[in-house]
Amino acid sequence: MKEPLIEVKREYNLIKTLTGKKFVVSTSIVVVLLIINMIFYGIRIHELAVIRRNSETHISSFNYKGQAQAQNKRVKNTRLFEKCKSKFNNFCIYGECMNIINLDKKFCICNKGYTGNRCDIVSIR
């Protein structure tokens, strides 16, 4: 089994003999480029952090100096329930009759102490 350190030294010596003194120069250039790269991206990361912080605290606004246009649309009925018509006054025994608008179904809102579909049962509670 070969020692890893011996193999690295052999490869280093092989590269050194193949490139001669150029190897030292190219290594220096790589080191300088790495340092420049670290400085550049260090500054960029700081700038990006500032941009992000500003975007999180920025509140956008705009000024509008125009006339509002009239809308000729009918407002849809947004109610779900309405009181029953007078002919259903006696539908709920001890409560108030309500109509589900879209289904035209009746239900009762019982007075305190009563329950059941038509508020006709005395509640035990």
Curated annotation (Swiss-Prot):
Subcellular compartments: Secreted
Gene Ontology cellular component terms for the protein in this record: extracellular space
Main location (coarse class): secreted
Residues in the signal sequence: 1-48
GO terms of biological process kind: epidermal growth factor receptor signaling pathway; positive regulation of cell population proliferation; positive regulation of mitotic nuclear division
Record keywords, A-Z: Disulfide bond, EGF-like domain, Growth factor, Secreted, Signal
Cysteine-cysteine disulfides: C84-C97, C92-C108, C110-C119
Molecular-function GO terms, alphabetical: epidermal growth factor receptor binding; growth factor activity
Residue ranges constituting the EGF-like domain according to the UniProt record: 80-120
Record-given protein name: Probable growth factor FPV211
Organism: Fowlpox virus (strain NVSL) (FPV)
